[in-house]
């Protein structure tokens, strides 16, 4: 019945195939044979209580560099359809999986907040990670920590055990919408 913080940086399996960097994919991953990065940015709700101590806009800015660049993402395709992660990575446009790096949920009689961002290593050298860690702990210890979504322990466990299939969705040709029209 308590609150649990799961720091899963480097330990996630389901989502491991998606490479995130701070800078978004250049133009189109299918043209570059799915070479990384695979994401086109992040989406966050800047009014969420977690971000009172980690100010942000609805997208990434420079304060996110340390947390996003080369961070692992989690894939949520096995979570409830309405589920929204607190920090949602935006997948490449033609695959559009639900992926993210931080979520909160009700689980059994307790509440969990899980992140795949590295918020704990070398806190003396990483002020951004240290501040995000503090913001998370303060949020979880407040009466504002009221997750909207419910997931099962198995759904969380599958983030560490499940693997996604390979995606080979690149082309040797131009996408149809960019081909010249020949009469």
Where are the regions that the model predicts?
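Short, surface-exposed beta-strand/loop micro-motifs that present aromatic residues
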Residues: 97-107
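Short, hydrophobic alpha-helical segments
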Residues: 136-147
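A glycine-rich, often tryptophan-bearing local segment used as a flexible ligand/cofactor-contacting loop or short
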Residues: 2-69, 128, 132-138, 153-161, ...
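Hydrophobic targeting/anchoring helices
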Residues: 116, 146-147, 160-166, 170
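A short acidic/glycine-rich loop-to-helix N-cap element
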Residues: 120-129
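Short, Gly/Ser/Thr-enriched beta-strand-loop segments that form substrate-interacting elements
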Residues: 78-99
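Short, solvent-exposed loop/turn segments at secondary-structure junctions
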Residues: 4, 11-13, 107-112, 118-121
């Amino acid at each position: 019945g308590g609150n649990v913080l799961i720091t899963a940086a480097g330990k996630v399996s389901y989502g491991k195939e998606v490479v995130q960097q701070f800078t978004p994919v250049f133009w189109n991953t299918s043209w570059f044979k799915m070479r990384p990065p695979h994401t086109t940015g992040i989406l966050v709700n800047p009014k969420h209580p977690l971000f009172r101590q980690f100010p942000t806009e609805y997208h990434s800015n420079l304060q996110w560099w340390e947390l996003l660049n080369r961070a692992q993402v989690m894939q949520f395709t096995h979570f409830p359809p309405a589920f929204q992660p607190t920090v949602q990575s935006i997948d490449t446009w033609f695959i559009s999986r639900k992926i993210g790096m931080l979520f909160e949920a009700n689980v059994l009689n307790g509440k969990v907040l899980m992140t795949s961002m590295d918020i704990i290593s070398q806190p003396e050298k990483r002020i951004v990670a240290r501040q995000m860690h503090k913001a998370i702990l303060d949020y979880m210890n407040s009466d504002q920590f009221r997750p909207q979504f419910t997931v099962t322990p198995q759904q969380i466990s599958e983030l560490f055990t499940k693997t996604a299939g390979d995606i080979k969705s690149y082309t040797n040709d131009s996408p149809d919408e960019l081909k010249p029209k020949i009469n």
